[in-house]
Every structure is written in C-alpha cells, then in structure tokens.
C-alpha cells in the first residue's frame, strides 16, 4: 500500500494527511505525525476523506417525483415547464419574497452568474451565497483591522496570546485542530461572544451571551 502525503481540502487550516492508496483508491487516512500545522492530529472530517471517492454520474435528464413519491425521468422541456409553473404559483400565492436562493462556493463562476441572472431578472427574487456569509466577511475584517485581506497571524499566536476572543465561532466542534492549539496556552483568558451556549462558550473563561441575531450586525 502506497503512502501519499497531501493537504486536507475541507477548510483553510490546511492540515497534512497521510493517504494510504491501493489500486488507485484511498483505503485509509491518518494525520501526518510531524507536520507543524496539525501536529499529528486532525478532525473527523479529514479522517473520512476516503469516504468521498464515490463517483456520481451526472444525470442527462431531470427527475420528477410522482404522487407515490417515486422519481421518474422527464424531458428537459417538461422539467423547465413544471419548475416555472410551480414557482410562479408559489409567488402568486405568497408574494415574490416567498422565494429566495442561496448559492455555494463549489460551482463555476459561469453557473453562478447564470443563477443570479435568472433569479434577479426573471424570477425577481433575492439571493445570497456562501461567499458573503463566509470568506467575504473575513476579507473585509482583515483589511479593516490589519490593512490587507489575509490573516497576518499564525497558529503559534494561539499558544502565545494573553487573551483570545471568539465571536460567533465554535472551534471546539468546527476546528478542533485549532482548538487544540488554543488549549496548549494554559495562561490565556478565553472569551466567547455568542448568543448560543456553544461547546466553545462552555470551555471559555468568559461567555458573553448577547441577544440572538445581534452577532449578525
């Protein structure tokens, strides 16, 4: 079995993993012991990367659920017609704002542009995306705080800081590798600002339980 070292692609922490490959298939995943980022540890998401190898063939025709809950193939013409009729009926009954779309960061730019064009100009609906709720906010925050749009700090700072503040973040669950580095700093005061009493809030020195939705301002 061949061992190949590579970087986990599931978050920006960039942990290093050892992939054990046989006959072109990943059979086992384990964290790289001496890598400086994750230091021999990784989260359950990285450990299960071998489960993401199933290739799903793209469908050539749409599927429509019948009255019994079974999926049947229909033509593209019927698919577009059915979608348009159903969406129009919903908007006529409940108003234009009853329908919205949210996009992902995992589709090509051209597809994203088409989705936005159809949504705004034809369906007259609101849309949002993963980008604005995720990295776009980080980019603006970094630029306003440090003068450029990338984080200037390193993981070592978590082990050396006097005070660490988490705002709406739950690294105990979302980024356990980073949280492990934080816990190595036994003298730091940890403050969590979050309307939820999250796992990170429970493990903090101070939990500031602000009003729900106030963290979106």
Regions found by a protein language model. Give the residues of each.
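N-terminal export/assembly segments and adjacent metallocofactor-ligating motifs
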Residues: 1-215
